[in-house]
Amino acid sequence: MSDAPRADIYDLAVIGGGVNGCGIARDAAGRGARVLLLEQGDLASGTSSASTKLIHGGLRYLEHREFALVRESLAERERLWAIAPHIIHPMRFVLPWTKGLRPRWMLRLGLFLYDHIGGRRALPATQAIDLRRHPAGVALKARFGPGYCYSDGWVDDARLVVLNARDAADRGVDVRTRTTVIRLARADGHWRIVTRSKRGEETVHARAAVNATGPAVLDLLHRAERPTDRHMRLVRGSHIVVPRLFDHGFAYFFQLPDGRIFFAIPYERDFTLIGTTDRDHDGGLDHVAASAEEIAYLCEGANRYFARSIAPADVVWSYAGVRPLVDDGSARPEAATRGYRLELDGGAGAPALLSVFGGKITTYRHLAAEAVNLLKPHLPMLQGGDWTAHAPLPGGDFPMTGLADLTAGLARDYPFLASATVDRIARAYGTQARVWLGAARNASALGLDFGHGFTEAEAAHMVTREWAQTSEDMLWRRSKLGLRLDRAQVDRLERWLEERL
């Protein structure tokens, strides 16, 4: 699917359809560039959909003295909430104090800094709590008493990527998924890029290129014959999803005796998301999965805190992603910096190649703005500065505290939808839900129901407006309905896709 007309040469080719690549493509298009976005798989099919689903400052990074990164991340937290209040929500996190681990003075100091260095405005401040009286204490073992409650944000990470791509396409970006870059080389003052897709091999040309391929950044540089002294550290983060362990909206920040931390987060109404691990990854990137050891580790960690025990057999879904971190020589993978580096190759008549090293979801927008600023001397059509801080993503054009009102409006206008379906739709599409719900006055107007309120109208929207091509794209990235649909329902969806595509 392409939303831009063909021409002989693009101003900018962005290689990589994760959050950084889509963010850069959107920003550059909004400043006047003609952009091509190339992704070898589905949007967000790599690291960007395998996060802990948080928009956060990174409380644990204070321990590693990454004050600048935490400050930047905290500042971005409320900016992102404001431009995408349907897929980003404030969340309160409960941090129990655990005897023998980090002392209370250290936790208080860290939380004080967390509250004050990032320009917090709308989110509530940290509070000291007594877990013997606090609602979040009910699910925990009785030995936990003192604790703290602080603010951060939750995000639907894959939809964040898709919405950046959608907005980019609306601004003229040519988005091509399932398109592999097999060769790229400088030729006649521009980049000559050879791609392979179901359409066969094609050659495109661009005045500048961005390498936003995440864990494959060094591989692409090698193919472009542009060596770098930069070293990457690939760190695997694994997560598990289990049936709901608690009946409230708080999340948990837990410490472990090995010094690591992990989260337990309310997830998709009926589940709890637990993660993450930090393990150096030396395998391939095509099929990254949580190991049995990591799954057991997360279960054991949860069992140190929750009154109800879980085992690997309770895990209904697990996933893992490889984080492409800048190798700063840290002894332990969890201590490696989550900051990013932008490396520009080009000048003196040579077309620019900008490579992205590292980064985290929370800083993607700021990274994109900085990347486009670096490209301005090479692309004179780029006009203006950072514009994305106040430009809503598709569906996010409503007040940042207005999700409940938006949901109520959908429930009123589409009374035939189940309340759980209305809630899911509001949190996925925001104001854009009405684009595909349209004037429907009954369920049959939305076509087939594949299960749990997932209708033909919604599936068609994913295909025509969100680049979905497979059931996995729909059920595990555009939504998380894969947690609910059974095999027969998935088969029915796949038959529908075969007929349509």
Enumerate the language-model features and the residues they cover.
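Dinucleotide-binding Rossmann-like beta1-alpha1 core, especially the glycine-rich loop
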Residues: 53-136
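Flavin (primarily FAD) binding-site architecture
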Residues: 211-226
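Short hydrophobic core segments
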Residues: 13-15, 204-214
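A short, basic/flexible loop-to-alpha-helix module at the beginning of a structural domain
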Residues: 1-9, 200
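C-terminal catalytic lobe of FAD-dependent flavoproteins
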Residues: 151, 157-159, 167, 227-238, ...
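Glycine-rich FAD pyrophosphate-binding loop
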Residues: 29-49
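Helical element adjacent to the flavin cofactor pocket in flavoenzyme catalytic cores
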Residues: 148-203, 207
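Beta1/beta-strand and adjacent pyrophosphate-binding region of the FAD-binding site
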Residues: 6-20
